[in-house]
């Protein structure tokens, strides 16, 4: 690999793998430049979506300690390097795949595990972090209100009992 362009591309891929939380591999065969540009815009700034030679991606991934991608690196492959919320990116990729039949999610890598295409699509069905935290906060708030009601119930029952006893004495 004495080609300087390959060496530069490999160095860039290594850097991306090093600073990335999640990687998704896709097949882009049949997409136009306009469609690819549309996808890049939809993915946003936290995702770098680029086409690279499969051999360079294999080498960079292996040197970064990422295993399990070799079988996915066949045919024309583009890599989505995700720095932020993987769920949001998976949702964008899934929606784009539904709208553009030529686009295929091959699989990926997240939290030390290789992912199949089905697993990436399953991630797209999850709620993102903010929504999950909001649901959790709502559930906790409801539980705390119930607990406060339970703690206040004995005190109000004692007060009602005292009033009833007083009324009985007066009668």
Curated annotation (Swiss-Prot):
Belongs to the universal ribosomal protein uL10 family. GO terms for biological process: translation. SUPFAM superfamilies: Ribosomal protein L10-like. It comes from Corynebacterium glutamicum (strain R). HAMAP family: Ribosomal_uL10 (MF_00362). Part of the ribosomal stalk of the 50S ribosomal subunit. The N-terminus interacts with L11 and the large rRNA to form the base of the stalk. The C-terminus forms an elongated spine to which L12 dimers bind in a sequential fashion forming a multimeric L10(L12)X complex. The keyword Secreted does not apply. It holds the Pfam family Ribosomal_L10. Forms part of the ribosomal stalk, playing a central role in the interaction of the ribosome with GTP-bound translation factors. CDD domains: Ribosomal_L10 (cd05797). One of its GO terms (molecular function) is large ribosomal subunit rRNA binding. This is Large ribosomal subunit protein uL10. GO terms for cellular component: ribonucleoprotein complex; ribosome. Keywords: Ribonucleoprotein, Ribosomal protein, RNA-binding, rRNA-binding.
């Amino acid at each position: 690999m004495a080609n300087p362009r390959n060496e530069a591309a490999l160095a860039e891929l290594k850097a991306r793998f090093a600073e990335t939380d999640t990687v998704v591999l896709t097949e882009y065969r049949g997409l136009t430049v306009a469609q690819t540009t549309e996808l890049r815009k939809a993915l946003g700034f936290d995702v770098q979506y680029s086409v690279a030679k499969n051999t360079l991606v294999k080498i960079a991934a292996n040197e970064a300690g990422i295993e399990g991608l070799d079988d996915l690196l066949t045919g024309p492959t583009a890599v989505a390097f995700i720095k932020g919320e993987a769920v949001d990116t998976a949702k964008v990729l899934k929606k784009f795949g539904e709208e553009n039949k030529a686009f295929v999610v091959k699989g990926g890598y997240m939290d030390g595990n290789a992912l199949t295409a089905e697993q990436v699509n399953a991630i797209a069905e999850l709620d993102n972090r903010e929504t999950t935290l909001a649901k959790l906060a709502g559930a906790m708030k409801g539980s705390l209100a119930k607990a406060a009601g339970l703690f206040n119930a004995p005190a109000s029952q004692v007060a009602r009992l005292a009033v009833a006893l007083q009324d009985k004495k007066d009668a």
